[in-house]
Amino acid sequence: MAKPFDVSKFRKSITKSVPGLSSGFRDPDTWISTGNYTLNKLISGDFNKGVPLGKVTVFAGESGAGKSFICAGNLIREAQKQDIFVILIDSENALDEQWLQALDVDTSEEKLMKLNVAMIDDVAKVISDFAKEYKSLYADKEEEDRPKAVSYTHLTLPTKRIV
């Protein structure tokens, strides 16, 4: 009979080789409200929670459905209320400063970094570079001493097949 796999050595070596890596489950402890109690309840099971920080959340839908209002407006504003720094990556160059300010989003450089990119590859590079820099600065700090940041990416994806 084969011995059961001893994961303890692997866990120890992998967590040492990747700075900031943790193992096991990590339930979210920070939630960002969508500004809509019904949507919060659908996403999180709680009227006051909304989107979990540290998880990937996608809002998709038809043009005019309110994705930009919910995400660019409400989620960014609510994140800023919790002192969460926002990186806004806009591939459409569709989110203008006056519109965001009208939704009570603080567009100052201390609270928001807006980046305009053209290609999906650029989005991946920006997020990857940010994650590497964040890890290099904060991997050795206790979780409560790390600043919180969130990336909101505004992408247009083709909805029809182009031949």
Q: Residue ranges of each PLM-predicted region?
A:
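Intrinsic low-complexity, intrinsically disordered segments enriched in polar/basic residues
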Residues: M1, K111, E144-D145, K160
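The Walker A/P-loop phosphate-binding site
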Residues: A2-E110, I120-S136
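Loop/turn-to-beta-strand initiation segments
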Residues: F85, R146-V150
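Conserved ATP-binding/catalytic motifs of P-loop helicase motor domains
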Residues: S136-R146
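Conserved small/polar residues in nucleotide/adenosyl-binding loops
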Residues: T153-T159
